[in-house]
């Protein structure tokens, strides 16, 4: 297929046009007074959002060369969202500012490679300075403030996220779901929960709530199907003698084995319940091992040399309480030894570090949370489906940002941290051409605060000047249109977000500046429609048929 090639300034101008188109659509959402963007959907109602990365992901331009520029900036937003969960609009604004200034310098005859080196040195210095300014997050209140800012100043969301973090701890899993009601609420699960319910409703001990509750229960963990009653007999006899309830977790329990368990339960001989093992394949084996470690039992598996008919009572795990409903099983206060649990946690953490798959990482994180913290579910409520989608996206953003804040600490928000770190660039001494890159970063770092002010209907230059003349956390609160101590006012950004936004923006803008040729497919010529064939005349003669 034939290609079109653009060189030098012609190519860079096309990139700039694409960058500007995408960035101008995204940056209207920045800050507390940022505007909404409405996105048409092929199905259902349009999507209304104030999330930069959502806007960026929807943009495809008709011109292939301009689209390349837009797609590269989209990459900045996506990467920042993946790493830090927030800061996508800031990253887009920075990328546009760096590339716009840089392309002017290159057009004026400066060496793009030297400018890029200057940009890289400046960014390194700023990142080090941001880490110096950064303060560790101390309490519930600061976690709530980070969540509030990231959720576009929604204090309810900030409060719920802080509460969830407090309940399940740093390692805990917090998931976001759609609620059936109008209110947004938080549900937490103590202990280990997995999504498998009882195999028969006859196991229920509380008919009103339709759940089985076993106090001081023994737990049998088996990785194969149980269909033959003979295999289970030795364990059941010992359970009947001990008088304690028994939970059986196996790949499946069917036929004669299940029928016998139900009959014994109904006659009151045994207080028993059976559930299927969670997960599939290798993940199932790992989860059964987790349950065994948590409850101080052993997985009865032929792979490990244990047969079910030879299982002894000391292979069973124990827990203070087990609750089973039709969908979930929750094991509370397992009797596993602390040392074994910590060893297992260490092992899972090592796997999280090594894995390259996001899906695997998420599943490992869930397993870790079940062992150490617990699970919290934020149920997002709203009046309409459109509002629900928008709100759920905000909650997810806020959750990521809060985790980032707990990881690396916080800096003053509203673009102030960038202004405060500018002083570090004064001490940099580089060759003249590279110094242009440093000057360019100095100008670009003012852009987020300018845009926040502009979206609030205030002159950005005046705000930048006033903030530069202030000290420490002094900055512009666009929500109330006043100058305040940003940290005291709760306007804070996670350091990880500010750092990632700048690093990703500078990385992609630097690559675009050093581009000398662009190649794209030539648009296909659409063939013209063929003319109507002749010979269709003469139909009028049919009038004589009357």
UniProtKB/Swiss-Prot annotation:
ATP-binding in keyword set: yes
Keyword Manganese: no
Assembly and binders: Forms a cylinder of 14 subunits composed of two heptameric rings stacked back-to-back. Interacts with the co-chaperonin GroES.
Residues engaged in binding ATP: 29-32, 50, 86-90, 414, 477-479, 493
PROSITE patterns xref list: CHAPERONINS_CPN60
Signal peptide annotation: none
EC number: 5.6.1.7
Domain of life: Bacteria
Keywords: ATP-binding, Chaperone, Cytoplasm, Isomerase, Nucleotide-binding
GO cellular component, one term: cytoplasm
Record-given protein name: Chaperonin GroEL
Organism: Geobacter metallireducens (strain ATCC 53774 / DSM 7210 / GS-15)
Enzyme class: isomerase
Compartment(s) of residence: Cytoplasm
One Pfam short name: Cpn60_TCP1
Reactions that this protein is recorded to catalyse: ATP + H2O + a folded polypeptide = ADP + phosphate + an unfolded polypeptide
């Amino acid at each position: 297929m034939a290609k079109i090639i653009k060189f030098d300034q012609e190519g860079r101008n096309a990139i700039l046009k694409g960058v500007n188109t995408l960035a101008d659509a995204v940056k209207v959402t920045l800050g507390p007074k940022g505007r909404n963007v409405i996105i048409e959907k092929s199905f259902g109602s349009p999507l209304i959002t104030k999330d930069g990365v959502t806007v960026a992901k929807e943009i495809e331009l008709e011109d292939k060369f301009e689209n390349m520029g837009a797609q590269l900036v989209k990459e900045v937003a996506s990467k920042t969202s993946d790493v830090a969960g927030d800061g996508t609009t800031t990253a887009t604004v920075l990328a546009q500012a760096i590339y716009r200034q840089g392309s002017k310098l290159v057009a004026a005859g400066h060496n793009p490679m030297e400018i890029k080196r200057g940009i890289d040195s400046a960014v390194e210095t700023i990142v080090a300075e941001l880490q110096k300014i950064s303060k560790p997050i101390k309490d519930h209140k600061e976690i709530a403030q980070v969540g509030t800012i990231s959720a576009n100043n929604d204090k309810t969301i900030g409060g719920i996220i802080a509460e969830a973090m407090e309940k399940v701890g740093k390692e805990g899993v917090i998931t976001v779901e759609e609620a059936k009601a109008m209110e947004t609420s938080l549900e937490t699960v103590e202990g280990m929960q997995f999504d498998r319910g009882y195999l028969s409703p006859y196991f229920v001990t509380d008919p009103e709530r339709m759940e089985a509750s076993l106090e001081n229960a023994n737990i049998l963990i088996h990785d194969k199907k149980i269909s033959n009653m003979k295999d289970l007999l030795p364990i059941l006899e010992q359970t009947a003698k001990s008088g304690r309830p028994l939970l059986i977790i196996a790949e499946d329990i069917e036929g004669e084995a299940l029928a016998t368990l139900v009959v014994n339960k109904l006659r009151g001989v045994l207080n028993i319940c059976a559930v299927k093992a969670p997960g599939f394949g290798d993940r199932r084996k790992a989860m059964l091992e987790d349950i065994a470690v948590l409850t101080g039992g052993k997985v009865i598996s032929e792979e490990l040399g244990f047969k079910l008919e030879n299982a002894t009572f000391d292979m069973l795990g124990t827990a203070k309480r087990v609750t089973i409903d039709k969908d979930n099983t929750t094991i509370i206060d397992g009797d596993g030894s602390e040392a074994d649990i910590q060893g297992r946690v260490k092992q899972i953490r090592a796997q999280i570090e090594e894995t390259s798959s996001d899906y695997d990482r998420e599943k490992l994180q869930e397993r870790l949370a079940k062992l150490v913290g617990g699970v919290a579910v934020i149920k997002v409520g709203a009046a309409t489906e459109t509002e629900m989608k928008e709100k759920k996206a905000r909650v997810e953003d806020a959750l990521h940002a809060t985790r980032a804040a707990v990881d690396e600490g916080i800096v003053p928000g509203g673009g102030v941290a960038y202004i405060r770190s500018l002083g570090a660039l004064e001490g940099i001494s580089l060759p003249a051409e590279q110094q242009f890159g440093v000057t360019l970063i100095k100008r670009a770092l003012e852009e987020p605060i300018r845009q926040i002010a502009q979206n609030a209907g205030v002159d950005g230059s005046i705000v930048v000047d006033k903030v530069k003349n202030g000290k420490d956390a002094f900055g512009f609160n666009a929500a109330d249109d006043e100058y305040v101590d940003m940290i005291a006012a709760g306007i804070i950004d996670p350091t990880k977000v500010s750092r990632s936004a700048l690093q990703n923006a500078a990385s992609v803008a630097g690559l675009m500046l050093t581009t000398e040729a662009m190649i794209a497919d030539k648009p296909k010529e659409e063939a013209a429609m063929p003319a109507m064939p002749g010979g269709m005349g003469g139909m009028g003669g049919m009038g004589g048929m009357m």
